[in-house]
A protein has these predicted regions:
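C-terminal accessory regions of radical SAM enzymes
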Residues: 1-4, 167-239
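Short linear sequence elements within intrinsically disordered, low-complexity coil regions
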Residues: 18, 22, 73, 162-164, ...
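Noncatalytic linker/hinge segments flanking ATPase motor cores
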Residues: 101-107, 130-137, 153-161, 194-202, ...
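Radical SAM [4Fe-4S] cluster-binding motif and immediate context
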Residues: 1-154, 174
């Protein structure tokens, strides 16, 4: 059995589809509200995890923070905690928020795998639609370094973003083929209420949100099944 825990709350990023700000840091549909991040203190995490493992006999720990590796100091402190706890662990991470050498430190403290959200393999989509602020070439290098340490990498991608073309979706498929991921999650875009993407779908306008780019190719579909079937058919074809 695996315990799912958090070492922080909040996220400073403003991805257009993310439900986290609406549920954890206040409803922020236009992307203008400041995003705060709170890290639990190492002493608290050590006591909490020690009690958790002793009482419920979990064998592994998964840190489901929106971004576990948000800054070198937090990762270094949590690695020190996990060395004391001495159980295998994994975490939800970004590819670009710590020094490359800290991936090895995570591995040495018991981390066996990370989950990373790329969302798209097309840089324009990442920059102007998702608003993820992620350099895909740097992310590719990070995956190579993570794999070098012996940790596994689970990658997540989403299709059907507003303004995303078929060619850009196929760019994602090609990008995936270059990463050497251990496992993969591909999803259709869901416009969840409270997110900038939901506001965009309903009004076709998101003037205050600087990350999204709306164009004539974006056709909101209220019937999720229709959207899913269309995406599935498209991705089965050969670019």
């Amino acid at each position: 059995p695996q315990a799912q825990v958090w070492s922080s709350r909040g996220c400073p990023y403003k991805c257009i589809f993310c439900v986290w700000p609406a549920t954890m840091t206040g409803n922020d549909p236009d992307g203008t509200q400041k995003r705060s991040v709170r890290h639990y203190k190492p002493d608290y995490m050590e006591a909490f995890l020690t009690e958790l493992m002793a009482k419920y006999r979990y064998r592994t720990i998964y840190f489901d923070d929106d971004t576990f590796n948000l800054g070198d100091k937090h990762v270094e402190r949590m690695c020190a905690v996990m060395r004391k706890i001495n159980v295998p662990w994994s975490a939800m991470c970004r590819a670009d928020t710590i020094r490359m050498e800290l991936w090895q430190e995570m591995k040495d403290s018991g981390c066996f795998g990370v989950k990373i959200g790329f969302e798209s393999g097309n840089q324009e989509v990442v920059d102007t639609i998702v608003n993820k602020r992620l350099d895909l070439e740097y992310a590719r290098q990070a995956v190579a370094e993570i794999k070098r340490t012996g940790m596994t990498v689970h990658g997540t991608f989403t299709y059907g973003l507003p303004g995303e073309t078929a060619t850009q979706m196929f760019d994602t498929k090609r990008f995936i083929s270059t990463l050497g991921l251990d496992t993969l999650q591909e999803s259709g875009t869901a416009e969840i209420e409270g997110t900038p993407l939901h506001t965009l779908r309903n009004s076709r306008s998101l003037a205050k949100y600087s990350g999204a780019k709306l164009d004539d190719e974006y056709v909101p579909e209220l019937d999720g099944r229709v959207k899913y079937d269309r995406l599935a058919a498209l991705l089965r074809t050969t670019p």
